[in-house]
Amino acid sequence: MFGVELVPCIQTLAHLHNALKWPGMDKIRDSADILQPEKEETYQFIEKLLSSVKENFSTNRVHLGMDEAVMLGLGNYLKENGYKKGSLIIREHCNRVVDICRKLELKPMIWSDMYITANSTGGYYDLPENTDCSKWEKPKKDLGLVYWDYYHDDTRTYEKMLDIHAQLSDNVIFAGGSWIWNGISPNYSKTYACTKAALSTCKKYNIKEVLCTAWMDNGAETPVDALLPGLVLFAHLDFHGDYDETILKQEFRNCTDGEFDDFMALDNFDSLFLNTKENKEAQNPSKYLLYQDPMLGIFDYHVKEAGVNTKSYYQNIQKCMKECAKKTGKYQLLFSFYEKLAAVLSDKADLGMCIKSAYDRSDRAALKDISQNVIPGIICNLTDMKSSREKNLDERCKAIWL
């Protein structure tokens, strides 16, 4: 009942740039990251992929991907076959791959967006309410459709999307997410706002299965352990009728050996300009203020406009992270890394503005202090931060794999 089933998630249409860039893949390439449908070589390749899945996993379930193939049929396919509606291509491609799954006794699912975007003229979430899908191309009944949404905090959007999915399939799964792809630090306020709205609607629509994704877009810079508050929230809402933070905190402690409030403090890194408001727009100043060249000051305007004292703001976070690191042995490396990040940001976030201000005032003493003390201090903290991140990564990988 409470076992863990490892389900492989692969790609059998798009998001295959790293594979398709090689000359040996020329025959099955439609465009840079999309397989060419309706070629026997393509399905021979996919069958080999699925045979490997069958051989190496105990489950018979498999996620086939197939999302975001926006240029489907518009590359080599177009040159060789002429234009064909994307909705027909995706249906026929799905049917071929599902046939392979049946042959191998696998139960497939795919991301649902191509069945919506290929059947309409808008984006995935752009369809109006009460959209009639009766004339759309639809998947086979044994192909699961996974509706993915990590962005909306209003139940109305989820209701609209689930109404559309109900017209396409009786086999609908929902995928939300724990936002560890915001930058260097997690975005829990967006995770919680979206997940509460999503899962309450899924219950209303009697959706039997939900997934918590933890994507690693934009560099995979956030430590994986930071996904835990989002993951525990999914479990909490699955087992309880309503959200109860008191119960959630106890569940978090029981399941992770961590303190909920300590983890939630990580949300502050990107709340610099929000004044305690939720980070629903996924701002990530902790990333761009870390990486920006202080002599260019591309993002200095945001700091000036907000009138925020970045030094004291990140110094307070540094103190908080230091205390969190002391309290827990299991996550000491995680909070130590964020302590070092806060130390870097406390001096670097406004470095360019400090240099410019001192230069405009002809304040040689201030410039000398920045040159001889502040910048070397930042470099030292950066070195410590890098070492801490590498140590955290090393320890977590050893714990999982060795």
Question: What are the functions of these language-model segments?
Answer:
Residues M1-M25:
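Acidic/aromatic-lined carbohydrate-recognition and catalytic surfaces
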Residues I10-H17, G65-A69, M114, A214-D217:
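Short, solvent-exposed turn/loop segments enriched in Gly/Ser/Thr/Pro and often Arg
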Residues K21-M25, D67-M71, S178:
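Short connector loops/turns at beta-strand edges and beta->alpha or beta->beta junctions
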Residues T12-L13, I28-E80:
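Active-site groove signature of glycoside hydrolases
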Residues H17-K21, G75, T121, T157-Y158:
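Short, solvent-exposed loop/turn and secondary-structure capping segments
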Residues G3-E5, Y43-E55, T59, K79-L402:
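Substrate-binding groove of N-acetylhexosamine-processing glycoside hydrolases
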